[in-house]
Amino acid sequence: MASDAASLVLGIETTCDETAAAVIERRADGSGQILSNIVHSQIEDHAPFGGVVPEIAARAHVDLLDGIIARAMREADVGFAQLSGVAAAAGPGLIGGVIVGLTTAKAIALVHETPLIAVNHLEAHALTPRLTHALEFPYCLFLASGGHTQIVAVLGVGDYVRLGTTVDDAMGEAFDKVAKMLGLPYPGGPQVERAAETGDADRFAFPRPMLGRAEPNFSLSGLKTAVRNEASRLMPLERQDIADLCAGFQAAVLDATADRLKVGLALFRDRFGPPHALVAAGGVAANQAIRRALHDVAVAAGTVLMMPPPKLCTDNGAMIAWAGAERLALGLTDPLDTAPRARWLLDANIATPAKFANTRAGF
């Protein structure tokens, strides 16, 4: 049953390599406030391997989650009996971590007789701008992270239409792989951005994948290969070579992203009318060069850019709690036997989804 009452929701995020919990207050007028937002990054655990190791991530969630939740509740000055609901990311993600978070949420919900909200991790990213801005539906979302690159029409809570996606590598994945091939530390995205600041973006003629295509899909594997080929030709790499390669790669990503979003926004307008905003979420949206490029795209399309602060673009518990609160306000709760999901389409409610080039779109 839908409710306009204020709510307090605990959110739990364990889909990848952040162990996170937060408490959100959703007021009766639909606005929100973050009462606590605790995030423990496992970067140091995974850095020696150059990427996330699923088993290490899951074991870390087991070790850390109870303490993270206790800290979030203490910082919010809220007891479990005061909660209106417990939300957990139930997918998509690394299944071991998803199981840890969802099982913990189920235990809390069962013991305290509190509603459970099983949140789609991608929906949490999609709804976060409504926590930080007075944003009405519909709006156009650009979601770019280590596992996902999508353009999505956000029509309402639980109502999404994917307009475009990657046909190969996710954007964050491409940044990390380029960083690794150039010998930069993990996580690679911030390292590439930092190196690009002192590089010459015009030194290499890197391709702009999918430029001018009618469908707003992305492809980054060819660009990644072009960077590898140039790096191999220049071996051993000097510091300036690395900076120039990063600058050229990032510039190509920016050009391709601007073009793909231009097409995506036009498609949005044709199908749903003008969007209230272009919003961006996911870890890649913390990249300052990308944020500037998105602003220019929004202005050219006659709309505005709304973005959460960088700390809410990367994975966190506040976004899970907020998505849970938004769903709870509509009376959308889940049974305690809800299954964790490694793959979970954001637009799974769409009877005839758009055609995509391969199964990577199934995330």
From Swiss-Prot:
A single Gene Ontology biological process assigned to it is: tRNA threonylcarbamoyladenosine modification
Against InterPro entries, the record matches this protein to: ATPase_NBD, Gcp-like_dom, KAE1/TsaD, TsaD
Disulphide linkage map: none
Report residues binding Fe cation: 121, 125, 315
Q: Per its UniProt record, what SUPFAM superfamilies does this chain match?
A: Actin-like ATPase domain
Q: What is its main location?
A: cytoplasm
Which cofactors does the annotated protein need, by name? Fe(2+)
Keyword tRNA processing in annotation: yes
Give the catalytic activity. L-threonylcarbamoyladenylate + adenosine(37) in tRNA = N(6)-L-threonylcarbamoyladenosine(37) in tRNA + AMP + H(+)
Q: Which keywords, in A-to-Z order, does the entry hold?
A: Acyltransferase, Cytoplasm, Iron, Metal-binding, Transferase, tRNA processing
**Compartments in which it is found:** Cytoplasm
Q: How is the cofactor bound?
A: Binds 1 Fe(2+) ion per subunit.
Q: Name one GO molecular function term.
A: N(6)-L-threonylcarbamoyladenine synthase activity
* Similarity comment: family membership: Belongs to the KAE1 / TsaD family.
Q: What role does this protein play?
A: Required for the formation of a threonylcarbamoyl group on adenosine at position 37 (t(6)A37) in tRNAs that read codons beginning with adenine. Is involved in the transfer of the threonylcarbamoyl moiety of threonylcarbamoyl-AMP (TC-AMP) to the N6 group of A37, together with TsaE and TsaB. TsaD likely plays a direct catalytic role in this reaction.
- What protein name applies here? tRNA N6-adenosine threonylcarbamoyltransferase
Upper lineage ranks?
Bacteria, Pseudomonadati, Pseudomonadota, Alphaproteobacteria, Hyphomicrobiales
Q: Which gene encodes it?
A: tsaD
